């Protein structure tokens, strides 16, 4: 996962330890896509402890050579239709304006499941170290009807 993030050149690279911890302790809400035993994509997320109806998607990435093949969309769909997300009514994530791929992915997902997408202030750039980080916009999709829009859980 760490390598996929590093290769993306769009996502914030966290420590390898962080990705190991996510894989170990959030297995219900973190998925990988493998081809020939190589991780070609992943999604990390968690259900908000303060609101179990909200799934926060932290990062989603796909290897450059596999982008545009629907892997990120499939990961997101598999995640939201999984057993651990049956109570989830909203998906939230933060995206920087220059991350066109993530912006397209979440907008497409909202349309496909026929759920509203709201955009609001997320995390201001001044919260991040250095001068190179953009503001992160908060994206919220929902409410999600698991029996509507093609999602069957």
Regions inferred by a protein language model and the residue ranges of each:
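Conserved active-site alpha-helix within GNAT-family acetyltransferase domains
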Residues: 73, 97-121
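Conserved beta-strand in the GNAT
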Residues: 32, 38-47, 54-56, 61
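A short, internal acetyl-CoA/4′-phosphopantetheine-binding micro-motif in the GNAT/acyltransferase core
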Residues: 59-67, 95-96
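A conserved beta-turn-beta hairpin within the catalytic core of GNAT-like acetyltransferases
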Residues: 48-57, 67, 86-87
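A short helix-loop-beta-strand connector motif used in the catalytic cores of GNAT acetyltransferases and
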Residues: 21-32, 53
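Conserved GNAT acetyl-CoA-binding A-motif
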Residues: 83-97, 105
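Short amphipathic alpha-helix that is part of the acyltransferase structural core
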Residues: 1-14, 34, 152
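Conserved acetyl-CoA-binding loop-helix of GNAT-fold acetyltransferases
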Residues: 62, 68-82, 104, 108
């Amino acid at each position: 996962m760490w390598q996929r993030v590093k290769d993306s050149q769009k996502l914030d690279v966290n420590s390898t330890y962080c990705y190991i911890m996510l894989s170990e302790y959030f297995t219900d809400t973190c998925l990988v896509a493998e081809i020939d035993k190589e991780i070609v994509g992943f999604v990390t997320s968690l259900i908000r402890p303060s609101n179990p109806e909200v799934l926060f998607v932290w990062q989603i990435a796909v290897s450059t050579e596999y982008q545009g093949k629907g892997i990120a969309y499939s990961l997101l769909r598999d995640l939201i239709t999984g057993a651990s997300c049956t109570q989830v009514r909203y998906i939230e994530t933060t995206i920087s304006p220059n991350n066109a791929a993530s912006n397209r992915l979440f907008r497409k997902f909202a349309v496909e499941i026929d759920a509203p997408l709201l955009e609001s202030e997320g995390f201001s750039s001044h919260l991040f170290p250095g001068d190179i980080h953009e503001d992160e916009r908060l994206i919220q999709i929902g409410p999600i009807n698991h029996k509507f829009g093609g999602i069957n859980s």
